[in-house]
């Protein structure tokens, strides 16, 4: 199903014309209404007159998370505060939060994008959405809620946590669509199994999962345990939260709503554009945002873009699954390691639960990496030989994929702390 066929299936030439018109308007707005961007453009020797098509976007300055924090809280807003009707913020690990302001038009556009996503998942007005993303400053809960209401669905505003009640209402209310992080979906699946309630009494059919990286192996695990079709929903709070991109029924990549958020892929070191299909850092420019439009925002997400028409009929660009983040990449003894690589190995082996912890340290001037991973109950044994054989199998597979050795410690089921939000998978104790 397609929510807005006129946009989602528009020919590329017509789409580029729309993007060019919207980019020029956005640049004019930020140049006149946002001192930060006016100064940035003046330093580069450009004015809005230099931006006449979407191809001219490469002339514009980049924006980073540090720019948002340096202009905290409302320094990048392009409208008076009287027009800002909602404020969201992401809680970074350190320092002040990243603040984003929305006008009524911004919220409407965001809801439109989420409606496209949920429709692509096969959801509609007859569905009951259980929104288990956090409500509040985090964009997930309120964003998914508005998108579900926009397609006419019923919404249970559960928010995150309180797992026992989540299961009760999911069972009693007949929830058909679950919105949460993929790690919490797995946690819910285990909790449902332990509750003793028969899975066939649940009516879940679709999951919209995002807010953290996940793998195809994790998707299969979720689908098997919950008996649903699991879809990726992409977003980031600086741009619009969930709904920036979405999968269709083909699941051959994530369609980006590029009539609102124009994507580029650049080399993270040189910041030069890369060819279509090549991996690099994802960059977004707002084309319709009123409250706080951003130019060439560096997401730090590593991926690639594909512009050929999807077999679903959509022409919107497709993005590969996020490989990782350029700022999350671990360099271990000169080797680039992404946590998603390790997760893929764990999830392809039936002996292990999808719960792990990666501990990185530096001892005697040498990087060390210890992986703690839970063994499934049916494979866990008190027999040392069996555990050693299982450990050896995992070590060999990791060596093959990563190209370096990993110290592995097999732990008992349910011994690694669970999270109802984004899972904390990596602890890097090195003094870099």
PLM feature spans:
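Nucleotide 5′-phosphate-binding alpha/beta core
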Residues: 1-89, 94-112, 116-120, 365-373, ...
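Conserved S/T- and glycine-rich ATP-binding loop of Class I adenylate-forming
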Residues: 30, 90-93, 129, 178, ...
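AMP-binding/adenylate-forming
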Residues: 104-117, 128-187
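Short helix-loop-beta connector
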Residues: 123-127
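Conserved helix-loop-beta element of the AMP-binding
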Residues: 128, 195-214
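AMP-binding/adenylate-forming catalytic core of the ANL superfamily
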Residues: 178, 288-402, 421
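Adenylate-forming
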Residues: 184-203, 220-224
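Conserved AMP-binding/adenylate-forming
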Residues: 205, 214-309
């Amino acid at each position: 199903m397609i929510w807005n066929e006129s946009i989602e299936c528009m020919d590329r030439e017509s789409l580029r014309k729309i993007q060019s018109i919207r980019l020029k308007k956005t640049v004019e707005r930020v140049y006149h209404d946002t001192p930060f961007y006016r100064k940035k453009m003046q330093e580069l020797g450009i004015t809005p007159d230099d931006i006449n098509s979407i191809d001219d976007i490469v002339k514009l300055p980049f924006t980073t998370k540090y720019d948002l924090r340096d202009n905290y809280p409302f320094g990048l807003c392009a409208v008076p505060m009287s027009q800002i009707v909602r404020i969201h913020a992401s809680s970074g690990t350190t320092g002040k939060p990243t603040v984003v302001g929305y006008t009524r038009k911004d919220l409407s556009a965001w809801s439109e994008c989420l409606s496209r996503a949920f429709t692509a998942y096969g959801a509609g007005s007859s569905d009951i959405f259980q929104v288990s993303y956090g409500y509040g400053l985090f964009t997930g809960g309120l964003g998914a809620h508005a998108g579900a209401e926009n397609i006419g669905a019923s919404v249970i505003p559960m928010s995150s946590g309180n797992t026992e009640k989540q299961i009760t209402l999911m069972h009693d209310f007949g929830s058909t669509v679950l919105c949460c992080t993929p790690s919490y979906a797995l946690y819910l699946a285990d909790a449902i199994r332990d509750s003793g309630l028969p899975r066939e009494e649940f009516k879940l059919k679709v999951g919209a999962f995002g807010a953290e990286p996940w793998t195809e192996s994790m998707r299969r695990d979720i689908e098997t345990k919950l008996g649903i079709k699991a879809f990726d929903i992409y977003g980031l709070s600086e741009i619009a939260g969930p709904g920036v991109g979405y999968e269709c029924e083909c699941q051959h990549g994530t369609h980006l709503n590029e009539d609102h958020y124009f994507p580029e892929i650049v080399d993270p070191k040189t910041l030069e554009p890369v060819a279509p299909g090549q991996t690099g850092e994802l960059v977004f420019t707002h084309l319709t945002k009123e409250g706080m439009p951003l130019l060439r925002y560096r997401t730090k997400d590593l991926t690639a873009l594909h512009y050929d028409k999807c077999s679903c009929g959509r022409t919107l660009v497709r993005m590969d699954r996020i490989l990782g983040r350029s700022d999350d990449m671990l360099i271990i003894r000169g080797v680039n390691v992404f946590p998603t690589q390790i997760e893929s190995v764990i999830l392809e082996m039936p002996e292990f639960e999808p719960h792990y912890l990666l501990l990185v340290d530096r001892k005697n001037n040498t990087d060390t990496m210890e992986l703690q991973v839970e063994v499934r109950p049916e494979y866990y044994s008190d027999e040392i030989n069996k555990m050693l054989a299982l450990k050896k199998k995992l070590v060999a597979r990791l060596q093959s994929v990563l190209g370096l050795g990993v110290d592995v410690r097999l732990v008992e089921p349910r011994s690694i702390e669970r999270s109802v939000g984004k899972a904390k998978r990596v602890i890097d104790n090195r003094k870099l």
